[in-house]
A protein has these predicted regions:
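Helical substrate-recognition/capping region of FAD-dependent monooxygenase/halogenase enzymes
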Residues: 3-227
Length: 227
Protein backbone atom coordinates (compact mmCIF):
# COMPACT_ATOMS: atom_id res chain seq x y z
CA UNK A 1 0.00 0.00 0.00
CA UNK A 2 2.84 2.41 0.88
CA UNK A 3 3.01 5.17 -1.77
CA UNK A 4 1.12 3.01 -4.27
CA UNK A 5 -2.45 3.21 -2.96
CA UNK A 6 -4.31 5.82 -0.91
CA UNK A 7 -4.18 5.25 2.84
CA UNK A 8 -8.00 5.19 2.83
CA UNK A 9 -7.62 1.67 1.47
CA UNK A 10 -6.53 0.44 4.90
CA UNK A 11 -9.86 1.49 6.40
CA UNK A 12 -11.78 -0.84 4.10
CA UNK A 13 -10.44 -3.83 6.01
CA UNK A 14 -12.44 -2.86 9.08
CA UNK A 15 -15.53 -1.66 7.25
CA UNK A 16 -15.69 -4.92 5.27
CA UNK A 17 -14.69 -7.46 7.88
CA UNK A 18 -16.73 -6.19 10.84
CA UNK A 19 -20.13 -6.88 9.24
CA UNK A 20 -18.83 -10.19 7.86
CA UNK A 21 -17.63 -11.21 11.31
CA UNK A 22 -20.98 -10.27 12.87
CA UNK A 23 -22.82 -12.37 10.29
CA UNK A 24 -20.58 -15.30 11.15
CA UNK A 25 -21.23 -14.88 14.88
CA UNK A 26 -24.99 -14.78 14.25
CA UNK A 27 -24.72 -17.89 12.09
CA UNK A 28 -22.76 -19.76 14.76
CA UNK A 29 -25.34 -18.87 17.42
CA UNK A 30 -28.24 -20.13 15.34
CA UNK A 31 -26.36 -23.24 14.23
CA UNK A 32 -25.24 -24.17 17.76
CA UNK A 33 -28.79 -23.67 19.07
CA UNK A 34 -30.15 -26.08 16.49
CA UNK A 35 -27.42 -28.62 17.17
CA UNK A 36 -28.22 -28.51 20.89
CA UNK A 37 -31.88 -29.37 20.29
CA UNK A 38 -32.28 -33.19 20.14
CA UNK A 39 -35.67 -32.79 18.44
CA UNK A 40 -34.42 -30.60 15.61
CA UNK A 41 -32.97 -33.33 13.40
CA UNK A 42 -34.78 -32.25 10.23
CA UNK A 43 -34.27 -28.57 10.99
CA UNK A 44 -30.51 -29.16 11.29
CA UNK A 45 -30.42 -30.92 7.93
CA UNK A 46 -32.48 -28.21 6.22
CA UNK A 47 -30.44 -25.40 7.76
CA UNK A 48 -27.18 -27.05 6.73
CA UNK A 49 -28.29 -27.24 3.10
CA UNK A 50 -29.52 -23.64 3.11
CA UNK A 51 -26.37 -22.30 4.76
CA UNK A 52 -23.81 -24.43 2.91
CA UNK A 53 -22.65 -21.59 0.64
CA UNK A 54 -22.43 -19.20 3.59
CA UNK A 55 -20.43 -21.66 5.68
CA UNK A 56 -18.04 -22.11 2.75
CA UNK A 57 -17.47 -18.36 2.63
CA UNK A 58 -19.20 -17.88 -0.72
CA UNK A 59 -22.05 -15.66 0.50
CA UNK A 60 -20.00 -12.83 1.96
CA UNK A 61 -20.98 -9.63 0.15
CA UNK A 62 -19.06 -6.41 0.66
CA UNK A 63 -20.84 -3.08 0.36
CA UNK A 64 -19.74 -0.22 -1.85
CA UNK A 65 -16.45 1.37 -0.79
CA UNK A 66 -13.11 2.43 -2.24
CA UNK A 67 -12.48 -1.02 -3.72
CA UNK A 68 -16.09 -2.06 -4.43
CA UNK A 69 -18.04 -0.12 -7.03
CA UNK A 70 -21.77 0.46 -7.17
CA UNK A 71 -24.04 -2.01 -8.95
CA UNK A 72 -25.28 0.34 -11.67
CA UNK A 73 -24.06 -2.03 -14.39
CA UNK A 74 -24.64 -5.36 -12.67
CA UNK A 75 -27.03 -6.36 -15.46
CA UNK A 76 -24.05 -6.63 -17.83
CA UNK A 77 -22.73 -9.67 -15.93
CA UNK A 78 -25.36 -11.02 -13.56
CA UNK A 79 -23.32 -14.13 -12.75
CA UNK A 80 -20.55 -12.08 -11.16
CA UNK A 81 -22.27 -10.24 -8.28
CA UNK A 82 -20.38 -7.12 -7.22
CA UNK A 83 -18.94 -7.48 -3.73
CA UNK A 84 -19.02 -11.28 -3.75
CA UNK A 85 -16.32 -13.84 -4.39
CA UNK A 86 -15.49 -14.38 -8.06
CA UNK A 87 -17.33 -17.49 -9.23
CA UNK A 88 -15.09 -19.12 -11.80
CA UNK A 89 -16.23 -20.60 -15.09
CA UNK A 90 -14.56 -22.53 -17.89
CA UNK A 91 -13.23 -20.77 -20.99
CA UNK A 92 -10.75 -21.71 -23.71
CA UNK A 93 -7.24 -20.29 -23.73
CA UNK A 94 -6.59 -19.49 -27.36
CA UNK A 95 -2.82 -20.03 -27.49
CA UNK A 96 -3.11 -23.74 -26.71
CA UNK A 97 -6.87 -24.36 -27.04
CA UNK A 98 -7.07 -25.66 -23.47
CA UNK A 99 -10.34 -25.43 -21.57
CA UNK A 100 -9.55 -24.07 -18.12
CA UNK A 101 -11.26 -22.37 -15.21
CA UNK A 102 -10.54 -18.65 -15.37
CA UNK A 103 -10.38 -18.47 -11.60
CA UNK A 104 -7.76 -21.21 -11.46
CA UNK A 105 -5.43 -18.93 -13.42
CA UNK A 106 -5.36 -16.45 -10.53
CA UNK A 107 -1.94 -16.27 -8.92
CA UNK A 108 -1.31 -15.05 -5.39
CA UNK A 109 0.80 -12.15 -6.64
CA UNK A 110 -1.19 -9.18 -5.31
CA UNK A 111 -2.40 -8.12 -8.75
CA UNK A 112 -5.90 -7.16 -9.80
CA UNK A 113 -7.69 -9.27 -12.41
CA UNK A 114 -9.54 -7.55 -15.24
CA UNK A 115 -11.74 -9.62 -17.56
CA UNK A 116 -12.85 -7.86 -20.72
CA UNK A 117 -15.75 -9.74 -22.30
CA UNK A 118 -15.90 -8.70 -25.94
CA UNK A 119 -18.99 -7.44 -27.71
CA UNK A 120 -20.20 -9.55 -30.63
CA UNK A 121 -18.43 -7.64 -33.42
CA UNK A 122 -15.51 -6.58 -31.15
CA UNK A 123 -15.91 -2.88 -32.05
CA UNK A 124 -16.41 -1.62 -28.49
CA UNK A 125 -13.65 -3.86 -27.17
CA UNK A 126 -11.12 -2.61 -29.71
CA UNK A 127 -11.94 1.03 -29.00
CA UNK A 128 -11.74 0.51 -25.24
CA UNK A 129 -8.42 -1.30 -25.50
CA UNK A 130 -6.85 1.63 -27.35
CA UNK A 131 -7.16 3.97 -24.38
CA UNK A 132 -7.12 1.67 -21.33
CA UNK A 133 -3.89 0.45 -19.80
CA UNK A 134 -2.43 -0.54 -16.45
CA UNK A 135 1.07 -1.79 -15.58
CA UNK A 136 1.53 -5.55 -15.83
CA UNK A 137 2.72 -5.68 -12.23
CA UNK A 138 -0.55 -4.07 -11.10
CA UNK A 139 -3.18 -5.88 -13.15
CA UNK A 140 -3.59 -9.06 -15.16
CA UNK A 141 -5.86 -8.14 -18.08
CA UNK A 142 -7.57 -10.88 -20.08
CA UNK A 143 -10.01 -10.79 -22.99
CA UNK A 144 -12.75 -13.36 -23.57
CA UNK A 145 -14.34 -13.45 -27.02
CA UNK A 146 -17.78 -14.83 -27.83
CA UNK A 147 -16.61 -16.66 -30.94
CA UNK A 148 -15.39 -20.29 -31.04
CA UNK A 149 -11.71 -20.84 -30.38
CA UNK A 150 -10.55 -21.30 -33.96
CA UNK A 151 -12.42 -18.24 -35.19
CA UNK A 152 -10.07 -16.01 -33.20
CA UNK A 153 -6.33 -15.51 -33.67
CA UNK A 154 -4.13 -14.36 -30.79
CA UNK A 155 -2.52 -11.70 -32.96
CA UNK A 156 -5.94 -10.22 -33.76
CA UNK A 157 -6.35 -9.20 -30.12
CA UNK A 158 -5.35 -5.63 -29.18
CA UNK A 159 -1.85 -5.20 -27.76
CA UNK A 160 -3.38 -4.51 -24.34
CA UNK A 161 -3.94 -8.26 -24.05
CA UNK A 162 -0.48 -9.17 -25.38
CA UNK A 163 1.88 -7.29 -23.06
CA UNK A 164 5.62 -7.80 -23.41
CA UNK A 165 7.11 -9.18 -20.22
CA UNK A 166 10.44 -10.20 -18.78
CA UNK A 167 13.94 -9.04 -19.63
CA UNK A 168 13.51 -10.26 -23.21
CA UNK A 169 10.16 -8.49 -23.73
CA UNK A 170 8.41 -11.64 -24.84
CA UNK A 171 4.72 -11.16 -25.74
CA UNK A 172 2.33 -12.88 -23.33
CA UNK A 173 -0.18 -14.90 -25.30
CA UNK A 174 -1.99 -16.46 -22.34
CA UNK A 175 -4.38 -13.51 -21.93
CA UNK A 176 -6.50 -14.17 -25.02
CA UNK A 177 -9.47 -16.46 -24.37
CA UNK A 178 -12.67 -17.57 -26.05
CA UNK A 179 -15.80 -19.06 -24.57
CA UNK A 180 -19.25 -18.72 -25.99
CA UNK A 181 -20.61 -20.83 -23.12
CA UNK A 182 -19.35 -18.54 -20.35
CA UNK A 183 -21.46 -15.66 -21.67
CA UNK A 184 -24.64 -17.67 -21.15
CA UNK A 185 -23.46 -19.38 -17.97
CA UNK A 186 -22.60 -16.12 -16.21
CA UNK A 187 -25.25 -13.87 -17.73
CA UNK A 188 -22.79 -11.68 -19.62
CA UNK A 189 -24.19 -9.13 -22.04
CA UNK A 190 -23.52 -9.72 -25.73
CA UNK A 191 -22.72 -6.00 -25.89
CA UNK A 192 -19.65 -6.71 -23.80
CA UNK A 193 -18.64 -6.04 -20.21
CA UNK A 194 -15.62 -5.63 -17.98
CA UNK A 195 -15.43 -7.56 -14.72
CA UNK A 196 -12.84 -6.28 -12.24
CA UNK A 197 -11.65 -8.70 -9.57
CA UNK A 198 -9.62 -7.72 -6.52
CA UNK A 199 -6.42 -9.50 -5.46
CA UNK A 200 -8.46 -11.37 -2.83
CA UNK A 201 -10.73 -12.72 -5.61
CA UNK A 202 -13.78 -10.62 -4.74
CA UNK A 203 -15.58 -8.84 -7.58
CA UNK A 204 -14.84 -5.13 -7.34
CA UNK A 205 -17.10 -4.03 -10.15
CA UNK A 206 -18.90 -4.69 -13.41
CA UNK A 207 -18.59 -2.02 -16.08
CA UNK A 208 -19.39 -1.37 -19.72
CA UNK A 209 -16.56 -1.16 -22.23
CA UNK A 210 -15.93 2.54 -21.64
CA UNK A 211 -14.05 5.01 -19.45
CA UNK A 212 -15.86 3.93 -16.27
CA UNK A 213 -13.24 1.21 -15.74
CA UNK A 214 -10.45 3.76 -15.90
CA UNK A 215 -12.33 6.07 -13.54
CA UNK A 216 -12.63 3.28 -10.97
CA UNK A 217 -8.89 2.69 -10.95
CA UNK A 218 -8.02 6.36 -11.08
CA UNK A 219 -9.12 6.88 -7.49
CA UNK A 220 -6.82 4.04 -6.47
CA UNK A 221 -3.80 5.22 -8.42
CA UNK A 222 -4.09 9.01 -8.59
CA UNK A 223 -0.85 10.38 -7.03
CA UNK A 224 -2.87 13.16 -5.39
CA UNK A 225 -4.72 10.58 -3.28
CA UNK A 226 -1.53 8.83 -2.20
CA UNK A 227 0.34 10.41 0.69
Amino acid sequence: VYKRQPQELLKTYGTERQPAAQNLIDFDKEWSSLMADPNATQEVADYYVEAEAFAAGMMTEYSQNLVVSDTAHQDLATGFPVGRRFKSAIATRRCDARKLHLGHEHQADGRWRIYAFADTDKTKLNEWAKSFNLPVDFADIKVIYQQPCHDIEVLDAPELFRPKVGTLNIPMWENVWTGEDIFAERGISRDGAVVVVRPDQYVAGVFPLDESVENFFKRLRDPQTVE
